[in-house]
């Protein structure tokens, strides 16, 4: 029987060792859509981290009572309930941010990270370690979102959290904002660069090639 992972492992490994976006390539859609500024990136990061942590906790608590044939439905109901709570809290206390995030808070319900941890980890492990696994994967997702939001808002608008950092030419400053960074496709390139940097730093994350080219032989050797 495999040893149960420790809380420390499940909390910190997803940040660098097994990042949901950087290594598993999950949660890409929301990473493209909500990282044009740090405010929306931060709120989305907190929302997904809380939903992942508590959905793991509740699913793990009842994992032995869930029939295998309907386990996915039960997981979806729990996740959807938590997302509705988060969405209502945002609408009550941060309505403008809720409007900026649009449908992406609701789409946490179908986020691969949340569903994946519920199925792969919470269904097979005790509640406490499952909770921290959800928090850890949320932190890994959050780290990537905050890096993207920082780069895109700083160099795309000259601001951080809406506060001017680089004086732009429109305000009599020296910095010409790069508007391309505020467009969703720019996040694709930034994610690619971050993945390249992570795999350059951690060689064990580099995937083996799917196939190898056959060695070239001369016509004389062929006959």
From Swiss-Prot:
Record family assignment: Belongs to the NqrDE/RnfAE family.
Gene name in the database record: nqrD
Enzyme Commission code: 7.2.1.1
Transmembrane segments: 42-62, 66-86, 103-123, 131-151, 178-198
Keywords: Cell inner membrane, Cell membrane, Ion transport, Membrane, NAD, Sodium, Sodium transport, Translocase, Transmembrane, Transmembrane helix, Transport, Ubiquinone
GO cellular component: plasma membrane
Catalytic activity: a ubiquinone + n Na(+)(in) + NADH + H(+) = a ubiquinol + n Na(+)(out) + NAD(+)
Role noted for this protein: NQR complex catalyzes the reduction of ubiquinone-1 to ubiquinol by two successive reactions, coupled with the transport of Na(+) ions from the cytoplasm to the periplasm. NqrA to NqrE are probably involved in the second step, the conversion of ubisemiquinone to ubiquinol.
Membrane topology: Multi-pass membrane protein
Compartment annotation: Cell inner membrane
Keyword field contains Cell inner membrane: yes
InterPro entries in the record: NqrD, NqrDE/RnfAE
Protein name: Na(+)-translocating NADH-quinone reductase subunit D
Assembly mode: Composed of six subunits; NqrA, NqrB, NqrC, NqrD, NqrE and NqrF.
GO molecular function terms noted in the UniProt entry: oxidoreductase activity, acting on NAD(P)H, quinone or similar compound as acceptor
Biological process terms in GO annotation: sodium ion transport
Primary location recorded for the protein, binned into one broad class: membrane
